A protein has these predicted regions:
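Phosphate- and divalent-cation-binding pockets in alpha/beta enzyme and binding domains
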Residues: 109-116, 282, 414
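Acidic beta-strand-to-loop metal/phosphate-binding motif
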Residues: 30, 99-107, 402-404
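Conserved beta-strand -> loop -> alpha-helix junction used to position metal-binding or nucleic-acid-contacting
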Residues: 120-137, 150-151, 431-435
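Nucleic-acid-processing active sites and adjacent nucleic-acid-binding tracks
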Residues: 64-102, 438
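Conserved "right-hand" nucleotidyltransferase catalytic core of DNA-directed polymerases
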Residues: 1-74, 141-145, 153, 157, ...
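Cytochrome P450 catalytic domain signature, combining two hallmark sequence patches
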Residues: 123, 289-294, 419-430
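A short, basic-hydrophobic beta/loop patch
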Residues: 74, 426-437, 441
Length: 441
């Protein structure tokens, strides 16, 4: 299709009556936000993605393929709609209306910004990122998160090219663009228009090949995405002073361990985690220890598993070296606690909230479990392997408590549900231990 045919029905709209007219009668609406940092955070480009440090600049809406309107709310130039009128109108007409399906690409993002305004998206809703990950990208492989961006899906599935944020903004924030500039309008409108097109395309695919997946997207994954946005917005309250205090204690402990290691091996550079080439050369060339494991590039491995194997070998053949490996393993443990959990968590403490707001990804693992990133708050070390007390950094807000819950044997339980194996079902129904029942066979 020509560029004219793709973008000819996009327009900027600031009149509430015209906005209402455009949406009238539609039972499915796609929407997308453009955001920009608040004045105090303009030196951080990533702040535009943070609902605590940025604001909604405008919203685009699409009710028919090839058609969309852009409603500017907080542009410096070109004029804006009255947000005090538009936001309540869209809240009632779209976001909380049970008669309208709300479509967005990355619904968690939109949910987070609406929650900042006191609005929680109500079903029915549809996240096209979730839908993308529930479809096959080839005959044997489902799409991953990296395959599910709008700018990647549109050329692949619809054969069109979308304007990029960088091309349109040229290093500026979105609120610095003229709200009525055709390129501004084209960029903003394309996101909601193509979210709606993908919604239709994915549903056609589901209906033809995997109808159950459409049900899952509409009734499980998309509502979950809304609450992922809420959870990200709320974040985790962190004891930052305690983290800084422990950071110093860890640094002192690492220095102490490094000095003890140096007393055994001299001036060999062990680096931050005893994984340097110099240390490996010392182990395998100077000490002439056996290479028990190699890397993918056929080099000597020196990971935790390898060091454990070497320590066991030395206990039998070179017992005088066992204390060295004990020190190195202790050094690595403290190094990981400091770099991954203390230094790593401190980098993500939001200056506006004093909290960490990780991304929560419901479909990012092959097992179906949630994943988290920026940072990964799901892999806090167990207390038995944590002399620092990392989990104690996470605080309950005043008047609240933290509750730890865990599914019991969830994968096997799901397997029993689907395969209907009589013995597995009986074990669960009688409160037995499925692992004990398996090993007794």
């Amino acid at each position: 299709p020509s560029e004219r045919s793709i973008f000819m029905n996009y327009r900027c709209e600031t009149n509430l009556r015209e906005i209402e007219k455009y949406l009238r009668g539609a039972d499915t609406m796609a929407f997308d936000f453009e955001t920009a940092p608040m004045p105090a955070y303009r030196d951080d480009n990533k702040a535009a993605l943070d609902a605590h440090r940025s604001h909604i600049v405008g919203v685009s809406l699409s009710v028919a393929e090839g058609s969309a309107i852009y409603i500017p709310l907080e542009h410096f130039d070109g004029g804006n709609a009255d947000s005090d009128q538009v936001i309540p109108f869209l809240r009632d007409t779209l976001w909380t209306n049970p008669m309208v399906a709300k479509v967005a690409h990355n619904l968690a993002f939109e949910s987070m910004f609406l929650y900042a305004l006191g609005i929680i998206i109500q079903p029915p809703c549809y996240d096209t990122i979730a839908a993308a990950q529930m479809t096959l990208k080839n005959s044997f492989e489902f799409r991953g998160l990296s395959d599910s961006g709008l700018k990647k899906l549109v050329p692949e599935l619809l054969g069109d090219e979308l304007p990029t944020f960088e091309d349109v903004t040229s290093g500026r924030f979105f609120d610095e663009l003229n709200s009525h500039d055709p390129e501004t309008v084209r960029y903003a409108c394309a996101d909601s228009d193509y979210a709606l097109r993908l919604y239709r395309r994915f549903n056609e695919w589901f209906d033809a090949f995997l109808p159950r997946h459409r049900w899952i997207v509409e009734n499980v994954e998309s509502p979950s995405a809304v609450y992922c946005g809420l959870m990200k917005y709320n974040g985790l309250l962190m004891d930052e002073p305690a983290m800084i205090r422990k950071q110093g204690e860890c640094a002192a402990r690492l220095l102490e361990l490094r000095e003890q290691i140096r007393g055994m091996i001299g001036d060999v550079d062990v680096g931050a985690n005893a994984g340097t080439q110099a240390f490996k050369d010392y182990l395998f060339k100077e000490l002439n220890l056996p290479v028990l494991k190699t890397t993918a590039k056929n080099a000597e491995a020196a990971d935790d598993q390898t060091l454990t194997m070497l320590a066991e070998w030395c206990a039998e053949h070179r017992p005088e070296l066992v204390p060295l490996f004990e020190l190195v393993q202790e050094y690595r443990r403290w190094s990981k606690l400091k770099t991954t959990y203390i230094d790593g968590y401190l980098r993500f403490v939001n200056p506006a909230t004093g909290r960490i707001h990780p991304d929560l990804l419901p479909l990012a693992t092959e097992t179906g479990r949630f994943a988290a990133r920026n940072p990964n708050m799901q892999n806090c070390p167990r207390k038995t392997n944590d002399p620092v007390g990392i989990r104690a950094f996470i605080l309950a807000p005043e008047g609240h408590v933290l509750v730890s819950c865990d599914f019991s044997q969830i994968e096997l339980r799901v397997g029993a549900f689907y395969c209907r194996d009589p013995k597995m079902l009986e074990t669960y129904r009688t409160g037995g231990d499925i692992h004990a029942a398996t090993t007794s066979v």
